[in-house]
């Protein structure tokens, strides 16, 4: 049987014997998962085990689930799933009222020497090769967006950064990283050549992608959620994904685990 590349055009199905290792927290109301960076959140045409929600339904045997916070396919890390509508509303309200602090870990191209706050509005880019791409814009349709980047480790080629999105726009971290001139490593859309995304969609992983991308997916990981509820704070953390961990071990001389 041909082995499927998890970061290829056609990702493999979820192995339910491995699924329990993704669980960060579970009780009768919540399921918090550390999603791998090759899996879509929403159900797809390829069956229940082709998506995170489908795998969760298989695991919990619940038909009704509430995806409180989702991630793009190639972003790893925390995904919050509520098992009851009332719990979903509680968490969604906290997000809407900005009673939550989110922290991501990102590997950026280039040496970001000091922390910076990016306060640049974001809009959909109407023209261009990649139709789903957003960009920094002062157009009237643009929405305000604020992201804070704090370097943890830096060498000549890469930076491991803590990233704090203070708003929740689509692709916000990636758009702001591109605007700064320090795109996320492995980003096919907001990296140095967006035609790589088209090639990936049409052909899967190719030699040209291998030559131009330092990772097979975007090096972005949702690391922490800290909620401020009336009945007390709640924090969830997801260990860094294995592929990003391996990249850091290879490219940074310092012990990056001491910096997180």
Regions found by a protein language model. Give the residues of each.
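RNA pseudouridine synthases
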Residues: 1-146, 152-155, 233, 240-255, ...
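Short beta-strand segments enriched for Tyr within beta-sheet-rich domains
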Residues: 91, 169-177
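Short solvent-exposed strand/turn elements
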Residues: 166-171, 241-243
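A structural micro-motif recognizing beta-strand termini
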Residues: 107-109, 163-166
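Pseudouridine synthases involved in rRNA/tRNA modification
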Residues: 1-23, 176-260
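Short histidine-centered loop motifs in beta-beta connectors
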Residues: 156, 161-164
